[in-house]
């Protein structure tokens, strides 16, 4: 009998470890409404509803709260939908308590019985630290096999060109065919190549920013002077770009600086683009085109960060690095 009780306890413990429970509170304003539980891909772009499937579960809000439980699902992100709101969480093992804070009507992962809760970890990255660069990157690498890692990759992380292949190889095969961001990333990895020091530049054609003639990169790179291809994709880090170009001009007085960027609509960014053209003699390219037609695609820039490739006078890569 003692052995049997221990055996049952072991089964119960294992079962509990492999299930998630989410306790969603603070919903008093929606008392009596129905909350539906939906399953989404890691990037939250598509879910079961898009394929005509029913929700996983539903519950009525009683005393300002609902409770959902199920088997841990590391390959998906779940969403709880009630009138006018869809709130997401990662269905990891353990009991997660979410508190709906109004305003602005967002669920706060208050606590979890999982001491290694990635829901709580993500919340701290997001709302306490505003996604610090290295901690966010580490979150993605730690969760490369999980849906929550690719959700962060798709929206907030700076993963650099020479890291993408390795990161992709860590993903479960089940996610690769059903997650939009992974499908797009695989398409890029198959169509492009990763550069390393000593490699020749990759040619591309792009329109100059002021709607001038198209520019062929091979007309500049490998023509007897150093060339910096500097992707300006994070406008709140302008000072880092200024400093980098100044340093490059001190080291390579005849360097050509080519800056692919977006056509930002705000006056501050427009002013900075003008500054790059006039004060820093940079050639600005409009890289707002569809991703697969962009210079970003050719150079494996997947995300929003500033990054440079430095080529020597013969067009060989000297170094590649983020501009921080």
Residue spans for each PLM region:
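Sec-dependent bacterial lipoprotein signal peptides
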Residues: 1-11
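N-terminal targeting signals for export/organelle localization
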Residues: 13, 39-40, 123-197
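A non-transmembrane, solvent-exposed segment enriched in polar/low-complexity residues
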Residues: 13-139
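N-terminal "domain-start" segment that seeds a small globular fold
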Residues: 183-219
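Short active-site neighborhood of thiol/selenol oxidoreductases, capturing the structured segment around
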Residues: 216-246, 256-260
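Structural microenvironment flanking redox-active thiols in thiol-disulfide oxidoreductases
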Residues: 239-278, 290-296
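Thiol/disulfide oxidoreductase modules built on the thioredoxin-like
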Residues: 278, 287-324
């Amino acid at each position: 009998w003692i052995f049997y009780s221990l055996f049952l306890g072991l089964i119960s413990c294992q079962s509990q470890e492999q299930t998630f429970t989410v306790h969603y509170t603070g919903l008093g304003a929606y008392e009596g409404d129905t909350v539906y539980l939906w399953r989404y891909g890691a990037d939250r772009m598509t879910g079961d509803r898009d394929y005509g499937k029913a929700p996983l579960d539903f519950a009525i809000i009683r005393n300002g709260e609902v409770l959902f439980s199920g088997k841990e699902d590391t390959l998906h992100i779940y969403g709880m939908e009630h009138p006018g709101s869809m709130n997401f969480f990662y269905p990891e093992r353990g009991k997660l308590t979410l508190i709906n804070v109004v305003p602005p009507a967002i669920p706060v992962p208050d606590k979890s019985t999982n001491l290694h809760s990635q829901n709580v970890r993500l919340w701290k990255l997001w709302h306490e630290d505003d996604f610090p660069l290295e901690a966010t990157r580490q979150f993605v690498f730690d969760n490369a096999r999980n849906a929550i890692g690719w959700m962060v990759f798709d929206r907030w992380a700076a993963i650099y060109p020479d890291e993408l292949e390795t990161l992709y190889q860590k993903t479960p095969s089940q996610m690769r065919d059903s997650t939009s961001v992974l499908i797009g990333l695989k398409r890029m990895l198959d169509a492009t190549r990763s550069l390393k020091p000593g490699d020749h530049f990759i040619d591309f054609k792009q329109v100059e920013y002021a709607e001038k003639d198209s520019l062929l990169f091979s007309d500049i790179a490998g023509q007897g002077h150093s060339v910096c291809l500097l992707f300006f994709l994070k406008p709140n880090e302008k000072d880092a770009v200024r400093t980098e170009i100044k340093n490059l001009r001190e080291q390579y007085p005849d360097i050509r600086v080519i800056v692919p960027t977006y056509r930002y609509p705000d006056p501050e960014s427009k002013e900075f683009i003008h500054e790059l053209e006039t004060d820093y003699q940079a050639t600005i390219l409009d890289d707002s085109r569809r991703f697969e037609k962009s210079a970003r695609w050719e150079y494996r820039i997947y995300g929003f960060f500033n990054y440079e490739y430095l080529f020597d006078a013969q067009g060989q890569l000297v170094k590649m690095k983020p501009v921080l």
